[in-house]
Amino acid sequence: MTTQRYFILAKCYNKRGKLLSTAFNSYERTHPVQKYFATRVGLEDKQYLHAEIAAILKARTKKIYRISVERYGKDGQPMLAKPCLICQEAIKAYGIQVVEYTK
């Protein structure tokens, strides 16, 4: 059985709409913050670095107001990109006010 992998992109913006960071999902890397939130929601096996958490980390200490998440299939068509429980927990913890995603 093979795992279906998707291209996921996350972008963080400040309240004025300035782009602070962009990041992609990684099926090969992880980060202690990813592990922390995965453990917090009981999904310890989901430790690969999600695009949302990578983008939040890249923004560093800047105040993130909005995060946008895009997901595309192999054919390049947009797919549902609603953040998972892990990323929802991180978004909430970092005080991000607006969450947008492809549908």
Regions found by a protein language model. Name each.
Residues 1-103:
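Zinc-dependent deaminase catalytic domain
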